[in-house]
Amino acid sequence: MLSLLLTTTVVSNETISKENLFDFLHSKQYLKTSFTQTTLVDLNERVVSGNIQASRSGNFKIEYLDPIQETISADKEFLYKLDTELEQLDIVPREEYFRNTPISILISNIENLKKLYSINSCIEENLITVCSLSTKDENSFVEKIFLQFVGTELDSLTYLDSFGQSVNFDFDNISWEPFSENQLYISIPEGIDVVYH
């Protein structure tokens, strides 16, 4: 479901605002973080943990670690989904697959961020800023996205979707430092079936 960092950066004493949110996000060309994902639907809660690495080049890798073991990766051409339990790697043409998904906030350049999202508000209280965004595409399953910052550190991303789900990613140990995009590739274990779609 849900990838960053390098050009200009928001100075640490500056606050995130409606006016500078996209500039701030675009300044983060790389992201590497662990997360806890909590999905709430009809009062049922599901919690999974994992890691995300993402780049504004549009590439990313999400590793779900507990309780499921699944890796999702994307380069410019394909989406790769490795399910070690099923011993299967699915390869799907990428096309516009992530255009209207929350991962686009972490992998899109500033021009695409402005095309995809409207910033409704950024409210700051006691060093915590919550920004509310809406997708501009009426056909998107995502209805609202909330980004929470502590100071200028991204603390969480929450989205509400048209299926009645609330999905929250709490981030831990965030790094905005550049990394080799080779880290975004999936290494395929022996005995895995590869399925092209």
Predicted regions mapped to residue ranges:
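An acidic-aromatic
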Residues: 51-101, 167-168
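Short, hydrophobic/aromatic-rich segments at coil-to-beta transitions
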Residues: 30-34, 57-61, 126-132, 151-156
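Bacterial N-terminal signal peptides
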Residues: 1-8
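Non-transmembrane domains of secretory- and envelope-associated proteins
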Residues: 125-129, 136-143, 150-197
